[in-house]
Amino acid sequence: MFVDQVKVYVKGGDGGNGMVAFRREKYVPKGGPAGGDGGNGGDVVFEVDEGLRTLMDFRYQRHFKAIRGEHGMSKNQHGRNADDMVVKVPPGTVVTDDDTKQVIADLTEHGQRAVIAKGGRGGRGNTRFATPANPAPQLSEHGEPGKERYIVLELKVLADVGLVGFPSVGKSTLLSVVSSAKPKIADYHFTTLVPNLGMVETDDGRSFVMADLPGLIEGAHEGVGLGHQFLRHIERTRVIVHVIDMSAMEGRDPYEDYVTINQELSEYNLRLTERPQIIVANKMDMPEAAENLKAFKEKLQDDHPVFPISAVTREGLRDLLFEVANQLETTPEFPLYDEEELAENRVMYTMEDEEIPFNITRDPDGAFVLSGDSLERLFKMTDFSRDESVKRFARQMRGMGVDEALRERGAKDGDIIRLLEFEFEFID
């Protein structure tokens, strides 16, 4: 089964907890703190594997969680950093954040990697908190939670040339006679439901990859006829071969077909119209095809060349393939996303994001509810079983301006404050 879009959940590994420990050794009085730091959590990394052709594997596993770092130990022993979780994806995979709709990565080359969910930093042990005023601190940090998000994987096939046109105009037949591909061919619409790739070689030794894409109909850019699923695969092609049925046996006018398909391409993505387009008049072996071709050329406003062929009798294929190869030699690749745009999005998803420190809302019962990534991460990294850690958390909240913001919202002594699943009282 060909799967080209799937939604999955990814989570980086949590950092290991720091440790509270002291050096207890003979002849070493007042040995001081000796708690080690926790190890860093593993990242969720996507890597391109050219042996994969579909996102089928993601239908059966949709949750990917990297392992957490090892906890710190006594004698200042640092916890072991966790290994990254490497997930293989096929070339042509675009990774998008499901919430923000921002593109995280466009993976096209074999071995290319991208960090999709970063692991958390390991918590610090009590050795890190020693000061002249407090040489034996009784506090440490929990590990930082790993980044978690839902993402959408979208496969856009890698092909140099894309065959487009209405259903049943002969695209699959054309691919089958110019390459070794074996697409399903039948006399009904939407026989082709998934892209078929074939390697084409011309008589002079030039080669390229051609994709037989499912047929388009009017309204495809709005999703009609599964249009969105079909059009996404055209985006990477460098040359578009527009196949038109000149026999007009289905009652459609060839020129109207030509106009309709080009309108769908421009409505879906304006950059599709920038690609060279080769017009192919197929089924020239059928009656009235020659007359229809003459009328078609008269309606074309420009001197755009038209290649008359018959995929069944193989008439005109040599000239067509030479023209395709010539166009590929002079046509650069069309990146789906600018490098600057991708770089900006990658920066957006690092763990050092500029985030709103906190938000304050009210529950119906009058309690104040605190939220925000920075504050919640700080809360999760605090060890509330130790008094010094609790006092440090209170100082950090005060430094972030939480206390002052609560007073401005009308908080008074004894009011209930909620943060995640915990409650505590406000003390002014």
UniProtKB/Swiss-Prot annotation:
GO-annotated molecular function: GTP binding; GTPase activity; magnesium ion binding
Residues binding Mg(2+), per UniProt: 172, 192
Domain (Obg) ranges: 1-158
Highest rank taxon of the organism: Bacteria
Residue ranges of every copy of the OBG-type G domain listed in the record: 159-329
Residues the entry annotates as binding GTP: 165-172, 190-194, 212-215, 282-285, 310-312
Location of region: Disordered: 117-143
InterPro entries: G_OBG, GTP-bd, GTP-bd_Obg/CgtA, GTP-bd_prot_GTP1/OBG_C_sf, GTP1-OBG_CS, GTP1_OBG_dom, GTP1_OBG_dom_sf, OBG_GTPase
OCT domain residues: 350-428
Keywords recorded for this protein, A-Z: Cytoplasm, GTP-binding, Hydrolase, Magnesium, Metal-binding, Nucleotide-binding
Biological process, per Gene Ontology: ribosome biogenesis
EC number(s) from the headed UniProt entry: 3.6.5.-
Required cofactor(s): Mg(2+)
Record has GTP-binding as a keyword: yes
Enzyme class: hydrolase
Localization of this protein: Cytoplasm
Database matches in Pfam families: DUF1967 (PF09269), GTP1_OBG (PF01018), MMR_HSR1 (PF01926)
Primary subcellular site in the record, as a coarse category: cytoplasm
One Gene Ontology CC term in the entry: cytoplasm
Function, in words: An essential GTPase which binds GTP, GDP and possibly (p)ppGpp with moderate affinity, with high nucleotide exchange rates and a fairly low GTP hydrolysis rate. Plays a role in control of the cell cycle, stress response, ribosome biogenesis and in those bacteria that undergo differentiation, in morphogenesis control.
NCBIfam families, alphabetized: Obg_CgtA (TIGR02729), Obg_CgtA_exten (TIGR03595), PRK12296.1 (NF008954), PRK12297.1 (NF008955), PRK12299.1 (NF008956), small_GTP (TIGR00231)
Self-association state and partner proteins as the record states: Monomer.
Similarity field: Belongs to the TRAFAC class OBG-HflX-like GTPase superfamily. OBG GTPase family.
Protein name from the UniProt record: GTPase Obg
Name of the gene encoding the protein in the UniProt record: obg
